[in-house]
Every structure is written in structure tokens, then in C-alpha cells.
Swiss-Prot record:
EC number: 7.1.1.2
Membrane topology listed for this record: Multi-pass membrane protein
Gene: ND6
Taxonomic source organism: Anopheles albimanus
Name used for this protein in its record: NADH-ubiquinone oxidoreductase chain 6
A molecular function (GO) term: NADH dehydrogenase (ubiquinone) activity
Amino acid sequence: MTKLIIMTLCLIMSFIFMQMKHPLSMGLMLLIQTFLTCLITSIYVKTFWFSYVLFLIFLGGMLILFIYVTSLSSNEMFSMSFSLTLISLIIFSIFTIVFFMIDKSLIEQFITNMEMEKLSNMNNLINENILSLNKMYNFPTNLITLLLINYLFLTLLVTVKITKKFYGPLRPMN
């Protein structure tokens, strides 16, 4: 049920994204879409690490896009369409009503099955998380982890040294 609601929200956000004209509103819709995608991946994957890293990567890219967009279109007026908001609210309400009009016994059976599955898999999930973290920091893979840490640190230093304070794609402040 939760998956259906989140996927419905993704479809509605995709529809709204196609109707947006201002770059900042497009960025906001893309950020919400990314958050919903991360929620879906966290439902399917047993650990939240993948969806967390995915969200951070998208957020970093969105921050860079936000800087470029605000420097290039800073004087453009931002306005929200009331009719678009109303249409999306009506579509979401219709989907919610359709979900709740499904046979109640199927919904109750689905909820009890999910609760029983959560209770039975809780111990397996805890043990699996501990084992996956142990694998990451034990001998064969700890070298890859250290290499990744050093590479990211070196990339950070090179990026700081390459960028100059008064040059670049952003407009100078007067």
C-alpha cells in the first residue's frame, strides 16, 4: 500500500515537472522526485545505506545546479500556478480514494502479512547489517575503503586548488 502511494506521488510529480517553467521550481520537483525514489529503493533494499548515498549524490548535484541557475536567471520572477496545484491535488485525492475502495479484506490481509513478515525478518536483518559492516572493514575490502577515502580527499584538495576566488562561471558581485 505504501509502495503504491509513493509511486502515485512519483507519477504526479512527473506530471507536474513537465508543466514547470521556472528553473528553481524544476529543481524543487527534481529534489522531491529524488526523495521519493530514495524512499522506494529503501523499501526494496533491506538496508538504507544505498538510498542514503543515492540521495546525497543527487543532493550534491542539485546544489551545483542551484548555484548555476541562480546566477544565470536571478532576475526572473517565480510564480506558482494555482490551477496546476489544484489539478495535482485532485489527482492525488482520486488515487487515494481508489486505493481505499479496494476490498477491505485484501487490505487487512496485506497489512497482517506485512506485520508478520517484519517480525520474522527482524533478527535476520540485524544480523545481516552487522555482517555487511564487518565485511566492509575487514581485510580484503578495507584496502578498497582506504583507497576510496584517500581518493576523495585528494580530489577535494585538487578541486580547492584549481578553483580561483574571482574567476569562474558565476557572475562577479558589484
